[in-house]
Regions:
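Residue-level signal for well-ordered, solvent-exposed loop/turn and beta-edge residues enriched
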Residues: 6, 19-21, 98, 119
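N-proximal helix/coil linker or "cap" segments that precede and/or mark the start of modular domains
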Residues: 1-14, 79
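A short beta-strand-turn-helix
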Residues: 11-33
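Short pre-active-site segment immediately N-terminal to redox-active cysteine/selenocysteine motifs
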Residues: 31-33, 37-41, 107
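Structural microenvironment flanking redox-active thiols in thiol-disulfide oxidoreductases
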Residues: 46-85, 95-102
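A generic structural signal for alpha->beta connector loops
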Residues: 10, 62-63, 88-89
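Thiol/disulfide oxidoreductase modules built on the thioredoxin-like
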Residues: 82-87, 94-145
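Hydrophobic beta-strand core positions in alpha/beta domains
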Residues: 34-36, 67, 113
Length: 147
């Protein structure tokens, strides 16, 4: 992705679980965090979602995980999280897909790893499953946490 090694695009987005609240990307500075782009209409998100739930529940994934609800409506998004569980620290709405476009999203799901300085360090295209987690994401998170 052309954005690897570049600053993550700034955003101010509505919180899906608290619609009166807006979250700014500035709130994530100083943390190593993941942006998981998903949608209720996305078939492969249903494949990926239980794995992310498992990583978070088991404590293997301790970092802040921001779910970017991409080109989707409020009610189906909430229904999806009720049905499949909510692994996210924050769920932010991107109803027009503009933030996703700024990140260079081609399809969902995609997952971005962002370092403490706000730089995009890695991108998983398609579902993040055990292979991607074990080979790429987990070792990178450990390295970035140590920086």
């Amino acid at each position: 992705s052309p954005l690897i090694g570049k600053p993550a695009p700034a955003f101010q987005l509505q919180d899906l679980n608290h619609l009166d609240r807006t979250v700014s990307s500035d709130e994530l500075k100083g943390k190593v965090w993941l942006l998981n782009v998903w949608a209720s209409w996305c078939e492969s998100c249903r494949e990926e979602h239980p794995y992310i739930m498992q990583l978070v529940r088991s404590g293997e994934l301790k970092n802040t995980v921001v779910g970017l609800q991409y080109k989707d409506k409020v009610a189906p998004g909430l229904a999806f999280l009720t049905q499949y569980g909510n692994p996210y620290t924050l769920v932010l709405r991107d109803p027009e897909g503009q933030t996703g476009i700024n990140f260079g999203v081609y399809g969902v799901p995609e997952t971005f790893i962002i370092d403490k300085k706000g730089i995009i360090r890695h991108k998983v295209i398609g579902p993040m499953m055990q292979k991607e987690w074990t080979n790429d994401v987990k070792p990178l998170l450990a390295k970035l946490e140590a920086e």
